[in-house]
Amino acid sequence: GWKPRHVTLHNQNGIIAAVPCYLKYHSWGEFIFDWAWANAYDQAGLTYYPKLLIAVPFTPITGSRLLIQPNQDRTALQKRLTDAVSLLAEEEAVSSVHWLFTTENETAQLTQAGLLPRVSNQFHWDNAGYDSFADFLGALNAKKRKNILRERRRVRDAGIRFSWRTGHEATPTDWQHFYRCY
């Protein structure tokens, strides 16, 4: 599902800029739901896949997608990178190019370069100073607190278990499982 087609720019010392690009033959694992687009293409007799995706696989984290060494001319390299991505899209005959979860600054730069921005919503929870989950629950009214506790009890009673792992804690088996999920 994620065929790497990264764009890189080099000088005599090595890579100076890159864009993480993937050919996608489905929309799983992106956290952006474009099934309606794929369906519309199909109804019009067009092919939606493959598409070119600029993203970090399996994560909806906003971050830079125009990866440029700090000692380089950012403006010039941004143009070269976006031109290279457009050329790659033509070479691969993709239906479209999707830059996912770019920073506000990069979104503005890509829009200025003539790309259409994607507008979507993402919800974030900010800790308002709670020291524990119990502190968070204590700030809720009784009905909300009771509903959350009931939902968590149902999950536990169903035998569902979960654990948190950061990247360096994930084992090769974990990574294989993550990949199968998407």
Model-derived features with residue positions:
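N-acyltransferase acceptor-side catalytic subdomain
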Residues: 1-182
